[in-house]
């Protein structure tokens, strides 16, 4: 990590939604004004999960959180720190002075109106602002962001995504819900019916949209992207098992992506996952869904 001075945004940033965006824009703005680096300080895992031992479903993996902060908001550095016993027992004062200032060279801090930090969450935005003033650091506390009268929050967005309401979730995220994972081998049934797919198994405790068929875009690591029809679920027509998969038919793509990482962006839910009477019926419906996907992206061009 660079020893250069930094303006640091504080938070967990799950989803990197519009509320987080207000923090990140202010962070980059202040960093440019000072001629220093912009950074995010965040935890690799939810503190609540570590404290309680109960897994917390997340909108994004740590890697996707970092990618979104950098790609959407031009953050220079993402400081991703394990939430361990040392961090759990660090007082809020030491968190500011020993970690943010001495270890990561903060000269200005940016936090949300409801941010809590330090042992037992005893640090508050008010304490952060007064402490920064005493230490000669800059500090901004960012108010809540609302859309349509609803406060933008990761909790609300998690609910929308889990219900499959990805189009509505996008209003609060400011970008499509994404999932990045390595392509795995499937049963190649799609190839036999002329609809080859790429298959992902979602990482543990990362939210995928509710079961159904979606208009999506698949992005490759070389920067190219393709409109897609993506099925989330257990593929009842061809599979008697219960394993959840994310299966995408990339339109106008011909290639082998096995073993490569791809990013799936979810734009709109088309329908429920359905058990069809035959593969021909399944094929015909997927092709109709592909027409819907082409029309959707053409309307956005």
Where are these regions (language model features)?
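N-terminal catalytic cores of NTP/NDP-binding nucleotidyl/phosphoryl-transfer enzymes
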Residues: 2-61
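Residue-level signal for inorganic ion chemistry
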Residues: 17, 69, 109, 169, ...
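A structural preference for short, hydrophobic beta-strand core positions in alpha/beta folds
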Residues: 40, 80, 141-142
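N-terminal Rossmann-like or analogous alpha/beta NTP/dinucleotide-binding catalytic cores
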Residues: 47-135
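Glycine-rich, Lys/Arg-enriched anion-binding loops that position phosphate/diphosphate groups
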Residues: 132-234
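Phosphate/ribose-recognition catalytic cores of enzymes acting on nucleotide-derived substrates
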Residues: 186-301
């Amino acid at each position: 990590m660079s020893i250069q001075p930094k303006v640091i945004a504080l938070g967990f940033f799950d989803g990197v939604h519009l509320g987080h965006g207000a923090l990140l824009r202010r962070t980059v703005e202040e960093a440019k004004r000072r001629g220093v680096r912009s950074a995010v300080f965040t935890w690799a895992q939810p503190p609540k999960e570590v404290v309680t031992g109960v897994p917390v479903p997340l909108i994004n993996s740590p890697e996707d959180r970092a990618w979104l902060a950098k790609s959407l908001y031009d953050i220079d550095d993402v400081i991703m720190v394990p939430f361990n016993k040392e961090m759990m027992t660090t007082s809020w004062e030491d968190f500011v002075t020993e970690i943010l200032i001495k270890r990561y060279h903060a000269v200005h801090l940016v936090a949300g109106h409801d941010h809590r930090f330090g042992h037992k969450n005893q640090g508050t935005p008010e304490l952060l602002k007064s402490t920064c003033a005493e230490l000669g650091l800059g500090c901004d506390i960012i108010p809540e962001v609302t859309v349509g009268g609803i406060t933008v929050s990761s909790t609300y967005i998690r609910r929308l995504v889990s219900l499959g309401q990805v189009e509505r979730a996008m209003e609060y995220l400011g970008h499509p819900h994404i999932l990045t994972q390595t392509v795995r081998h499937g049963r190649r049934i799609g190839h036999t019916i002329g609809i080859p797919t790429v298959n992902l198994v979602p990482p543990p405790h990362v939210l995928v949209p509710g079961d159904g068929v979606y208009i999506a875009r698949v992005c490759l690591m070389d920067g190219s992207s393709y409109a897609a029809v993506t099925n989330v679920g257990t593929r009842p027509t061809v599979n008697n098992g219960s394993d959840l998969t994310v299966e995408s038919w990339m339109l106008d793509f011909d290639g082998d992506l096995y073993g490569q990482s791809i990013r799936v962006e979810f734009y709109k839910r088309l329908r429920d996952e359905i058990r069809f009477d035959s593969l021909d019926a399944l094929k015909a419906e997927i092709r109709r869904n592909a027409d819907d996907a082409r029309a959707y992206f053409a309307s956005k061009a």
